[in-house]
């Protein structure tokens, strides 16, 4: 799917500007992964996709997509095998806006996970789409 390369703000101002080096890493990852939007998420879940929130623990605790598993970006490579997730499972990753999840998706692909998707727009997109969330 083709999504914009500019951040989707959903009517909100981003808290900070990202550095050019970080954005370069994100763009490199985005060129090699699949992405979806929040509007696609319900159908993906209905078709068996596992949703993983890669934000920090405090972000997850403040609210997350209902049914999402939490594995932070900083530990996902180390901890994903602690869960019953196979290399062929469809996995949708999200973060705050789609940047961290893109990097994590590329990392999981490099580990052999073949059906990983990053949610472009992330948590902000989930909220804007009015999807079910919980704390």
Located regions from the model:
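Rhodanese-like catalytic fold shared by cysteine-dependent sulfurtransferases
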Residues: 2-50, 57-90, 97-135
């Amino acid at each position: 799917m083709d999504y914009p390369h500019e951040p989707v703000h959903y009517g909100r101002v981003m808290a900070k500007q990202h550095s050019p080096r970080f954005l370069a890493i994100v763009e490199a990852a985005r060129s090699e992964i699949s992405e979806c939007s929040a509007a696609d998420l319900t159908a993906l879940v209905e078709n068996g996709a596992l949703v993983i929130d890669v934000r920090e623990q405090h972000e997850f605790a403040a609210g997350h997509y209902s049914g999402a598993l939490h594995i932070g970006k900083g530990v996902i490579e180390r901890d994903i095998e602690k869960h019953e997730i196979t290399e062929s499972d469809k996995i949708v990753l999200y973060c705050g806006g789609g940047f961290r999840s893109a990097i994590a998706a590329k990392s999981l692909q490099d580990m052999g996970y073949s059906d990983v998707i990053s949610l472009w727009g992330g948590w902000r997109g989930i909220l804007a789409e009015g999807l079910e969330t919980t704390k």
